[in-house]
């Protein structure tokens, strides 16, 4: 019974998928299936409270449930809930496509994300990535009659296949050397070996390449802005949050067990990727006028910052730092994509250009304030949650003598402020003449489910930025428990 309790979120999501499948066979009803999805995700979130009171459990050798996996499962479920909230209106506006199957794809992908957060074995890691990525192909290309959507789907299919190939070949090489696939078995080998064989280094390198594709790290990031721009807004939201947070959490556990970061070649590779991601991501974003492309390059920079944590992952402050940063990143992205979704709905077209938001404050002051808060949080401005996360990363770098990397991180952050503040300034400029007749002026967005989600996100970003102690307590609790 205790073991069943530990995997309760997975069971609830699985039951919801079966229920929606049977319901579709009986009758198609978009509202009912959207409601079932939301209810299933809410129940899965509430079930985490029962999981918290249970003991640490190994359901199989593949899955390990502890406070760390519970925390990141919560992040995955919250992001999936936000995605389903944004999806309802988008699917309702695209009446040429049957909407019901989208929710099945979303829930299956969410199961893959949950599996990743609990992964304790390279097999579970690979299965989780594939279970999350394959439904995403259908989600990206759901409105396939649109040229840019079809283009994004084809690109994502190719990139996902290449990334999986690198990852799988890397796993095979690691297994060939260590004879182990479990994180603990690999950890035992890594702790007992001083000089790693060339084949093991090659395997680790290929795994890092595969993961870098998934996390949009330089030089494997070029697909990101194209996919963000081409995919529907709710799917871009999911790509920016769930698909990256779940993979990063799983790799955090692997590197926490097996100290590969102490090896010179691995550390050098991670340093190069981190520095290139921070600078190239931010520099490329400077020249963009499309919000989706800016957010795509921005995500590359943010995960470049987070790579600093992998270099010193055995430090006691690392898990707390990453938890704070990713929670702030999640809320800010949900808020920004939520605002874009609200604007797109009323105009019945994509509002992804910065110029479209010029003077928004003069017609929708609350919406512009929400957008401002999210941009300031992404930039790491004080009094927002994003500042707390960035402060922790800088502290982590200084405390571990990564002074050069920390200085480069600060310079990169200052570069990022240029494009974040450019968006903020445009919100308060006097609007162009064509915006005087725009339909969104009278649109009461705050009473919609998306509006409520956006308001809650912005409120949390501000409150936790001013008083982060409740979140700090949670991330201090969400530690990896070594079962050895």
Swiss-Prot record:
The keyword Nucleus is assigned to this record: no
Keywords: Cell membrane, Membrane, NAD, Quinone, Translocase, Transmembrane, Transmembrane helix, Transport, Ubiquinone
Pfam families noted in UniProt: Proton_antipo_M
Catalytic activity reported: a quinone + NADH + 5 H(+)(in) = a quinol + NAD(+) + 4 H(+)(out)
Keyword NAD belongs to the record: yes
Localisation: Cell membrane
Record field: transmembrane: 6-26, 36-56, 62-82, 99-119, 122-142, 166-186, 198-218, 238-258, 266-286, 299-319, 322-342, 369-389, 405-425, 452-472
Membrane topology: Multi-pass membrane protein
Molecular function as annotated in GO: NADH dehydrogenase (ubiquinone) activity; NADH:ubiquinone reductase (non-electrogenic) activity; quinone binding
The protein's Enzyme Commission number: 7.1.1.-
Gene Ontology cellular component list: plasma membrane
Domain of life: Bacteria
GO BP: ATP synthesis coupled electron transport
Assembly and interaction partners: NDH-1 is composed of 14 different subunits. Subunits NuoA, H, J, K, L, M, N constitute the membrane sector of the complex.
Family: Belongs to the complex I subunit 2 family.
Annotated HAMAP family: NDH1_NuoN_1 (MF_00445)
Function field: NDH-1 shuttles electrons from NADH, via FMN and iron-sulfur (Fe-S) centers, to quinones in the respiratory chain. The immediate electron acceptor for the enzyme in this species is believed to be ubiquinone. Couples the redox reaction to proton translocation (for every two electrons transferred, four hydrogen ions are translocated across the cytoplasmic membrane), and thus conserves the redox energy in a proton gradient.
Protein name: NADH-quinone oxidoreductase subunit N
Organismal lineage: Bacteria, Pseudomonadati, Pseudomonadota, Gammaproteobacteria, Candidatus Palibaumannia
Protein encoded by which gene: nuoN
């Amino acid at each position: 019974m205790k073991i069943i309790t530990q995997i309760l979120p997975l069971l609830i999501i699985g039951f919801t998928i079966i229920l929606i499948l049977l319901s579709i066979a009986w009758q198609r009803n978009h509202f009912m299936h959207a409601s079932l999805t939301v209810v299933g995700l809410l129940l899965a979130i509430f079930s985490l409270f029962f999981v918290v009171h249970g003991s640490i459990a190994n359901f199989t050798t593949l899955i390990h449930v502890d406070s760390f996996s519970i925390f990141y499962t919560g992040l995955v479920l919250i992001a999936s809930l936000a995605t389903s909230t944004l999806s309802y209106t988008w699917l309702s506006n695209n009446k040429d496509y049957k909407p019901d199957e989208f929710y099945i794809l979303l829930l299956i992908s969410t199961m893959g994300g949950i599996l990743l957060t609990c992964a304790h074995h390279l097999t579970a890691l690979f299965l989780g990535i594939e279970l999350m990525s394959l439904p995403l192909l259908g989600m990206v290309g759901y409105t396939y009659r649109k040229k840019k959507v079809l283009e994004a789907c084809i690109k994502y299919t190719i990139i996902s296949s290449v990334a999986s190939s690198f990852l799988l070949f890397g796993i095979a090489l690691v297994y060939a050397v260590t004879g182990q696939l479990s994180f603990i078995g690999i950890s035992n080998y890594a702790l007992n070996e001083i000089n790693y064989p060339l084949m093991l280094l090659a395997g680790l390198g290929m795994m890092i390449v595969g993961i870098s594709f998934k996390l949009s790290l330089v030089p494997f990031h070029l697909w990101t802005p194209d996919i963000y721009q081409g995919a529907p807004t709710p799917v871009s939201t999911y790509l920016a949050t769930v698909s990256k947070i779940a993979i990063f959490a799983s790799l955090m556990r692997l590197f926490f067990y097996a100290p590969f970061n102490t090896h010179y070649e691995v550390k050098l590779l991670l340093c190069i990727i981190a520095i290139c991601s921070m600078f190239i991501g931010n520099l490329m974003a400077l020249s963009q006028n499309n919000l989706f492309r800016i957010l795509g390059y921005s995500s590359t920079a943010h995960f470049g910052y987070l790579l600093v944590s992998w270099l010193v992952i055995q430090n006691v402050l690392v898990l707390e730092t990453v938890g704070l940063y990713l929670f702030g990143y999640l809320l800010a992205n949900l808020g920004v994509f939520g605002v874009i979704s609200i604007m797109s709905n009323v105009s019945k077209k994509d509002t992804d250009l910065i110029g479209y938001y010029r003077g928004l404050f003069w017609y929708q002051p609350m919406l512009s304030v929400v957008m401002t808060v999210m941009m300031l949080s992404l930039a790491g401005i004080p009094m927002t949650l994003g500042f707390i996360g960035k402060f922790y990363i800088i502290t982590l770098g200084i405390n571990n003598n990564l002074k050069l990397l920390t200085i480069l991180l600060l310079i990169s952050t200052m570069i990022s402020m240029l494009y974040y503040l450019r968006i903020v300034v445009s919100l308060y400029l006097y609007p162009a003449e064509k915006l005087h007749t725009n339909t969104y002026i009278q649109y009461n967005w705050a009473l919609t489910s998306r509006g409520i989600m956006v308001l809650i996100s912005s409120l949390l970003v501000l409150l936790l930025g001013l008083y982060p102690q409740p979140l700090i307590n949670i991330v201090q609790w969400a530690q990896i428990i070594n079962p050895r």
